[in-house]
Amino acid sequence: MYYYSWPYNYPFLPEMMGFWAFVAFVFGTCIGSFLNVCIWRIPREESIFSPPSRCPKCGHWIRWYENIPLLSWTFLRGKCSQCGNRISFRYFFVELLTGVMFLLVWLRIIFEQKPLALAIIYFAVTMLVITTVFIDIEHRIIPDETTYPVMFVGLAVPLIFPEVWGRDTRLEAFIVSFAGFAVALLLMLAFSLAG
């Protein structure tokens, strides 16, 4: 059992750990469904919030019960319910991957007794990285919409949780983070100049 003051306060008994792990996985799959929207729309410079999702071939608006993470793709056999157009396996895979990653993040937070608030940051970084990777795979681009937030988080987090980088002080953690940021910036500049 864990007895720590906030943010190290875990308000659940050991026998509830399985339940919360399941919640983390399900929450991750729901986020993964949203990431699929981002992966499709960001490269096309479309809003990620509206309009609702639809089939790119026939324009059929996806109903809520056709958009349940993992289950809908499975029951629809990877096809649009109206026109039968194939739905990429990537949708299922991203939902599953995000669910598994959120579960692993949650287990690390719990078993390493890290601040619960840190889970939110890890979740956010996971979302950004997954979105960036799959956009890069499909379009060979790394969008600013995901790159800049990752850089910001990388610089800001050490000021709040220096232990993320295994440092004792915020200054040490920030220096390590800034060094990584500088290297990434130089690489981006080099690739940009190389065309």
Residue positions per predicted region:
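Juxtamembrane/transmembrane-helix boundary motifs in multi-pass membrane proteins
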Residues: 12-20, 86, 90, 110-118, ...
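Membrane-proximal soluble regions of multi-pass membrane proteins
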Residues: 35-91
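Transmembrane helix-loop junctions in multipass membrane proteins, especially transporters and channels
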Residues: 41-49, 107-111, 137, 163-166
